[in-house]
Every structure is written in structure tokens, then in C-alpha cells.
Amino acid sequence: MAVSEIKPKLKLNPLTKVPISHNKRDRDLPGSLQCQLQHKEKKLSASQMAAFQDAYNFFYKDKTGCIDFHGLMCTVAKLGMNLTKHDVYNELKCADIDRDGKVNFSDFIKVLTDKNLFLKAVVPEKETCLDLAGNPGILLFEILSRLLETSALPRKSIIEIVSYFQRKFQHTGPGMLWSPYTMGYGKRTLKPDICTPPSSSMAAFANAARIAIMKEKDLFKFLEELKRCNSGSDSPYSKIPIFPLFPNVDGVVMGKPFKDMQKLEMLRIKEPLHFFEDYFFHKRDWKTQAANIKSMDPASGYSNNIFTIDQMLKKKQTCTVADATAIKQHVKRATDTYNLGIALEHRKEMLNLWQKIRGDLIGMDSRNESFYDTFSTYTWSWNVCQELLSPKDLRLYDAYVNRNSSHNSRSSSSSDTSECYTDSGRKRKRKGLKGFQQ
């Protein structure tokens, strides 16, 4: 057979698919990320657009209503962010999508809804905080974070923006931030260090959302690492105070009508004194513990624990390890006794302040009882690591004061009536004597 006859038979067909070995970038990319890159970004709702409009209105703008270089510099200075003119110019250039030298509302929305810029702000490549040179294009995210942290926007707008970015972070998938090939396609590896603080304020919001999408195994690792970093300490500042993680959305809603107040009061009376939050947060009954404290020794003028420590130190000139351990226990009890005493005094001051500002009338006038929760949070004390007055304590105190005031008013009215009767009797006697004398 001739060679010319064989050549047409050896002709290769054109490739219809790219071999897997040639597509290295797609092979290194996680499967979840491949799906998300194909996912089309949803349009913002009307409430979300209004929330971002409130954030846009915070910026200084020129006569045309756009953010120019001078307006961005003034906004940065107003928020207390120290940036050079060169950094602000580069950020303005990155945010200027239509290249007209200014940032209008359309550019503002496109930057804040861009997935790549959002991930760059959440997981910056540089470890330094607000490194605009290494992470260009994140200034608007940092400004927005400052506005959320300082509550410079309306409450409804804050809730809309935070909810939007939480959903956006969750849609990126848990493998995106935990994969070693994230944002670099194999060129960059993330080494998450839980002990270090977040490198940006936007990352703090993302870390809160990341816990919600963690698997159980990853969550246990996170807690173990957190326990390892936070070693046990007697310092009150090493303890984490209990505050609501999310704002009370129903705090601005008007209360029930006045006709339901009696029914509400009956429910309060039947309500148990120990809330399930006390059990959930392991709050101790420090008032009962303070009531069981032994009084001071009248001879020494100090508490029994301090007097015991003094006697132990006087008896022994040199202390062993066992003696130091025993003394440490007495010192801890004496410190707890002192903290409980200070907490009781501070609790009395808070009750006097509550009575002085008439806190019970504030809720009645506005028909909204959220002021009880607000004042209870204000009474937080590091001496007992919880609130000195719970909303239940304030309501019971109001009921006690109102009961005593009504009792005193009844007794005063009865005494006034008896005095009135005695005065009228005296007047009649005087008139009778005058008539008899005449």
C-alpha cells in the first residue's frame, strides 16, 4: 500500500472538548466555587436599594450629587480614618466604574455588590488592617462598616445591609474560605489564625456568618482553638459579657393597647422568677450568695476571711507551697466577698436612679416596655459578670413601690378624714359654748 493512501486515513478529527489535564485552573478550583461563579447575582430589592441609598447619602458630594475626590476625603476624615491623598485617589479610581472621575449611585451599588471586592474586603490578602495598597477597592466596604458600627444609619437600613451581606457570604459556600486555593487558584494559601483579631471590620461580620454555616466537626475545632487561646484567668476582663447578638427588631413596635395591660399583668404574676435565659447563660444567683455572707468580725473590723489570712501569716514566718494554696483559697473568698458587697451597693444606687428618673412611667407613656431591657443592660457589673437588675427585678420593684404608695395614700386619706371630723366636732363645741355664754 502506498504512503499517499495511508495519510488520509490517519487524519485526526478536531477536538470538541478540552482535556482535563489541560484545564489546570478548573481542576484546582473547588467544585462549590465553580458553581458559584456561574451563579448570577440577584437584583437588589426595593428595601435594599433604600438602605444603600441611606449609606450613599452619608457621603459628602458635589453639586451634581456625586462623590468626588474632595467629598471622599471629607467623609474619610469625618469617620476618623487616616489615609493619604494618594490612597484616596486610587480608591476613587477603583470605584469609578463609568470612568467619569466621580462615583455616582450606580457606581456605588456596583462596587458594594461585586463578589470579588466583597471577598477581598472580608478575607484580605494582607494581614495589616486597612491595607489599601495591598487590597485596592475596599475603602467603600470599610466606610460602610464604620457606618454600621457607629449606628450612623437608620435602624431599618442597618438590618437590611447586614442581612444582605450575611446572605451573600453564606452563598459563597463554606469551602470558599476554608479551601487552600481560595481567591488565588493555587497561588495563595490561607492560614486562618483564630487567636488574631479580624484584619478588617467587614471580616468581623463575615466571621459571625461563617459560624452559622460551619459543619459540626469544624465547629468543635473552632471551640477547642478558642479555649486554647483563652486560658483561664481570674480577671473580670477575661470573661465574655452576655449581650444580644442581633438587635431587637421589635424594639420600635408599639406596645399592646391599654385594655390588654391587665391581662399582661396577670401573665407577669404567674411568670416564674427564674427565666430560661438564666439557665442557658448559667447566670448565678449572686444576691442569695451575697445574703449568705458572714458579717464582719466586730473585734477586728474585717471579714472572717481576711482575719484568717492575717492569722495564718502571723503564725508562720515562711510559707510552703501547701500554705500558699490555702492562703490563695482564702484570698479568693475574700475577693468574692468584696465584689459581692460592691455589687450590692451599686444595685441600691441603680434602684435609686430608676426611681429618680421614674423608669416605670417611661414605658407607660410610650406603651413600649423595652426600656426595662435597656436599663437592665445599663446595670451590667464586672463584679458579678452579669446585670445587677434584670427586667423582672425592675418590674417587681415597681409593683412594690406602687403598692406601698397606694397604701400610704389610703392611710393618709383616712387620717385626713378623721382629722376633718375632729375639727368639725371642735367647731360645734365652740359654737355651743358661745351660745351658752351669750
Curated annotation (Swiss-Prot):
Biased composition (Basic residues): 426-438
InterPro entries: EF-hand-dom_pair, EF_Hand_1_Ca_BS, EF_hand_dom
Sequence ranges of Low complexity compositional bias: 405-415
Residue positions where Phosphotyrosine is found in the record: Y279
Gene3D superfamilies: EF-hand (1.10.238.10)
EF-hand domain: residues covered: 47-82, 83-118
PROSITE patterns: EF_HAND_1, EF_HAND_2
Positions that bind Ca(2+): D96, D98, D100, K102, D107
Region spans: Disordered: 405-438
GO molecular function: calcium ion binding
Listed name of the protein: EF-hand calcium-binding domain-containing protein 3
Keywords recorded for this protein, A-Z: Calcium, Metal-binding, Phosphoprotein, Repeat
Highest taxon above the source species: Eukaryota
One Pfam family here: EF-hand_8
Species this protein is from: Homo sapiens (Human)
